Amino acid sequence: MQRRHFLSSSAAAVSALAAPAVWSQATPKLTPFKFTLDFRITGQTSPFFLAQQRGYYKDEGLDVSIDVGAGSVASITRIASGVYQMGLGDISSLIEFQASNPGTPMVQAVYQYYNRAPFVIVGRKDRGITTDFRSLEGKKIAAAAVESTRRAWPMVARKLRVKNDLFTWSTTDFASRDNVVVRGDVDGATYFHDSAVSLFARMKPEELSVLQYTQAGVNLYGNAILASTALTTQNPALVAAFLRATNRAIQESMADPTAAMAATKVREPIINEGVELERWRITQQYIAAADTRSHGLGDIFKRTLEQQVDEVVEVFGLKSRPATESVFNRAMLPATRARIVNT
């Protein structure tokens, strides 16, 4: 009896000691992590939701919450304020922000999402707009007040040697942009190329001209994944973990875009998966642009970024020039082999 009692007591003790270990393995402690998008939830940013759905962030020890944005410029101030640790924002606007706030940078780019900026102006052909930027002369073009495509126009004007006021701006909000083009209140509007899918669904392709900034010889890096400098300095491992999970999801989104759109629809049930799939096809062209074939996703050519910094500083008459290394910090990028484009 005593032996049986001893054995059962020992078994209970072993179970009690083992239980905390089993519990800790089943529910590892996750680090809360806030990420801001540049805009609303669409196929453009589907990899973030695929990573979330498939548990890649949790696998890296992160409890990631993803919030909609208010534009690719606003993301920078959200991160600088400390409300968000990371986000998606325009790198030209980051250059301008750093130049206006000299000293130790508050925000850095850590992964180049759009290897080329998807900046376009979409114009109505019945208003005489062709793929020649000079056809915009005297026209009325809609754009949000603070929007990166609009902000980058002076770089195109400089490259083409035309005046900044070649056309007239009509300030509107993002939600009204398609409507004013369709109604004919304006002659065209600025877009991210992939954002224009909503307009393409309402007007026939043969009715529209798409003027790409890249066709004017303006080769800019676009939206990048940004991080607060406090985070990159104090906890670079956290940034690296987020980038590993996201990079994995970007690769898988390119390989299986249907799955990526399905994951996005879980978060935003009102989206049309067919429309978002078409949007992603355009997005992918800018994410996996030619440069990525040599250095992989997420990285940059230093000389190209230096030229972009010089261009932004000169065009906007900024008083200081941020160092390229302060704008883009590649130290936390995933291994090159994980970033080589597989599709």
What does each of the following model-derived ranges do?
Residues 5-24:
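N-terminal export signals
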Residues 65, 73, 277-285, 323-337:
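Short linear loop/turn motifs
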Residues 56, 62, 162, 204-205, ...:
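Helix N-cap/coil-helix junction residues
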Residues 235-317:
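Secondary-structure end/capping motifs
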